[in-house]
């Protein structure tokens, strides 16, 4: 059977549901999928969402369910994770990138510990925009109570530098909406609970901006291998991470040594020459006036002035539990693992650990999430939001995302 062609007629946005356990994230995901089936004709059953398949990202197993749906103006890919640990791992590894999120809070219970934790994570790992759905509103008879919960959530969002006053809030009942559409598709105006789902998606359409596509960003490619071709010069190979590169462009070689500037004299892919390479292409780039010894795996080629080498940074890290193939014992400040960044392992020291409340921690247990400050022995091209793995003798013991560059 031929695969159905992906129609690229509407702009594509990646979103996800976040929030405390049992506040209704998965039910909401199913309700959105079923409600919007009026536009696309397909919906995903709740039992399929809950039994999410395992995926591997940077050596970590994560359960995530992917659901697609469409509104009148957009195509969405929606990620929902069954367990709290899966959320933490997904957000830190960036296994399913989110351009925005729907924060689900039970109106009957108000914000809970994981509500706070997911907002903090969204801030740290760069989920730029959130919309709030106050679920289980059918269980709240008092309008004032709903307003109180809304104020509480607003305050929580403000604490983590989200614009609480601007963020759209929609209240409703995912369960009642789902039950209503199970009897057949509903148009706007047919059912008050289904209408709340339409309202929610209208807020998502309007408030969460379409992301800048990889090809629109500045050029960057991590070097995987280097060859020299007699009479022509040095070729660096790798996959273009973002942007577009044309013959004749000036680029910088960043990381490990002093930054060098050079000119692109040729671009090849599968033994054919190209005028330009773009995000996603595996290419060989011929560069002028650079010796093979001047460039090595782990450096990056980038548009001049867009990325610089650093040694010290803060990161949000998930440490693998022993049942995930991680360490069996805790590690302490001063621990020296390898940080696997893009294409290279660099040794670094963990200078300090910080808990969510800002208190210093001396040690970290397998299975923990922690904020850490790390210092590498060699400077490499690092930027905020960049993902990495922490390895020890070749096995992954943690995953992280850079939240702040220090020096």
Swiss-Prot record:
Residues 19-26 are annotated as: G1. It is found in: Plastid, Chloroplast. It catalyses: GTP + H2O = GDP + phosphate + H(+). Keywords: Chloroplast, Elongation factor, GTP-binding, Hydrolase, Magnesium, Metal-binding, Nucleotide-binding, Plastid, Protein biosynthesis. One of its GO terms (cellular component) is cytosol. Residues 59-63 are annotated as: G2. The keyword Hydrolase applies. InterPro entries: EF-Tu_GTP-bd, EF-Tu_GTPase, EFTu-like_2, EFTU_2, G_TR_CS, P-loop_NTPase, Small_GTP-bd, T_Tr_GTP-bd_dom. GO terms for molecular function: GTP binding; GTPase activity; translation elongation factor activity. Residues 173-175 are annotated as: G5. Residues 80-83 are annotated as: G3. It comes from the Eukaryota. PROSITE patterns: G_TR_1 (PS00301), G_TR_2 (PS51722). Residues 135-138 are annotated as: G4. Its EC number is 3.6.5.3. Residues 10-212 form the tr-type G domain. GTP binds at residues 19-26, 80-84, 135-138. Mg(2+) binds at residue 26. Belongs to the TRAFAC class translation factor GTPase superfamily. Classic translation factor GTPase family. EF-Tu/EF-1A subfamily. PANTHER family: ELONGATION FACTOR TU, MITOCHONDRIAL, ELONGATION FACTOR TU-RELATED. GTP hydrolase that promotes the GTP-dependent binding of aminoacyl-tRNA to the A-site of ribosomes during protein biosynthesis. This is Elongation factor Tu, chloroplastic. It comes from Emiliania huxleyi (Coccolithophore). The gene is tufA.
